[in-house]
Amino acid sequence: MTKSDLLFDKFNDKHGKFLVFFGTFVDTPKLGELRIREKTSVGVLNGIIRFVNRNSLDPVKDCLDHDSSLSPEDVTVVDIIGKDKTRNNSFYFPGFVDTHNHVSQYPNVGVFGNSTLLDWLEKYTFPIEAALANENIAREVYNKVISKTLSHGTTTVAYYNTIDLKSTKLLAQLSSLLGQRVLVGKVCMDTNGPEYYIEDTKTSFESTVKVVKYIRETICDPLVNPIVTPRFAPSCSRELMQQLSKLVKDENIHVQTHLSENKEEIQWVQDLFPECESYTDVYDKYGLLTEKTVLAHCIHLTDAEARVIKQRRCGISHCPISNSSLTSGECRVRWLLDQGIKVGLGTDVSAGHSCSILTTGRQAFAVSRHLAMRETDHAKLSVSECLFLATMGGAQVLRMDETLGTFDVGKQFDAQMIDTNAPGSNVDMFHWQLKEKDQMQEQEQEQGQDPYKNPPLLTNEDIIAKWFFNGDDRNTTKVWVAGQQVYQI
């Protein structure tokens, strides 16, 4: 049994067949809405949420009321409140969704010098991706990235791998073994690559078909699905894009690629594809824009391009860390949302220097503030909006919002347990800031007489904000994917 086998087996609960999670549940069902449900029980069977009871007095009874054929022995309760049922500042939050992660580039995290996109690809990116044709190197990197993203609460990831067929199959294997929900893509590039890292058109297409078949027929795991991955327009011939488009439509597969990341890149695309009206039009003309297409970056879109993306119902992966690191620009997220375009968050490792979607969300918050400084306050994103992008927004981009993103009946239970008081936590709160509602009311009455007598108390929204700005993987104590525990601190 491998180390990965042990890791996966260790955390899978084999007690009662019906799981009931009890405590405070926080999610964002709509953009701008932060839903907080205290003392709530959520029943999960076979990975699916079967009931949600607010103000629960007895989680086991809730389960037996839901299904009278059950006995107490059939029920396992995960309780983060404790016997005294007092406020402890732990809560369940939906698993994060990373819509853009170059898993193969992880060894280069933090290494980009003073480069911008195109020279960064040549100097740093292509060499490290080529190195992962070595299975031993690839296995070490993939195990690290999957484990690390899970430890940061990321339950769903769209992975870009490399042009190598064997290592892409390995990535799918390890993702299934470790229990992460993933889209796995073999990068396609048959033009404008270095001699040591490029494919011919036939090999690129046929290896993609093999990956799709391998994932669907050999891995055969509902958590692991293929995604067609033309790197970006400059690295793909017209013939290759047309072949990939037919595959996507025939097999109903996701697509992921890059769009409008860098001004020099945009000019290059215009030079390479003079028959197309814009960068977006290249993908549209060659059939790669579908409702299951994920477009990373989209910083410098024109109004016309945004209209096409909306019409084709594509989703956009906002990658604020890498956009800043490579000085690519600031994506106008509010502008996209106002047009009804789906937006999620992407770590974009390795130009993005963190595997954490929470860190990425903080950067999205900051970038929106910088945009507002030269535009209007309307460009600002709130904490709840950034958390929406990190969960439900990402699920929408990946066309998984009917099954992921919130704690609602019928959805998969992809979740993380957050403990703001975890050992070493960077989220500092003082006991006198934290009291029950009746104590808060008493204090408010006292403050009415003397506003300086007692310090202000933290609301639930305040606690979520402190976690958003100061939290990290130390606060993510457990993680579940489809009801199976896949990580424990």
UniProtKB/Swiss-Prot annotation:
One of its GO terms (molecular function) is guanine deaminase activity. Keywords: Cytoplasm, Hydrolase, Metal-binding, Zinc. GO terms for biological process: guanine catabolic process; guanine metabolic process. Zn(2+) binds at H100, H102, H258, D348. Its EC number is 3.5.4.3. Binds 1 zinc ion per subunit. It is found in: Cytoplasm. Pfam families: Amidohydro_1. One of its GO terms (cellular component) is cytoplasm. Substrate binds at H102, V103, S104, Q105, R231, F232, H258, L259, S260, E261, D348. It is an enzyme of class 3 (hydrolase). It catalyses: guanine + H2O + H(+) = xanthine + NH4(+). InterPro entries: Amidohydro-rel, Guanine_deaminase, Metal-dep_hydrolase_composite, Metal_Hydrolase, Metallo-dep_hydrolases. Its cofactor is Zn(2+). Pathway: Purine metabolism; guanine degradation; xanthine from guanine: step 1/1. Catalyzes the hydrolytic deamination of guanine, producing xanthine and ammonia. Belongs to the metallo-dependent hydrolases superfamily. ATZ/TRZ family. Present with 279 molecules/cell in log phase SD medium. This is Probable guanine deaminase.
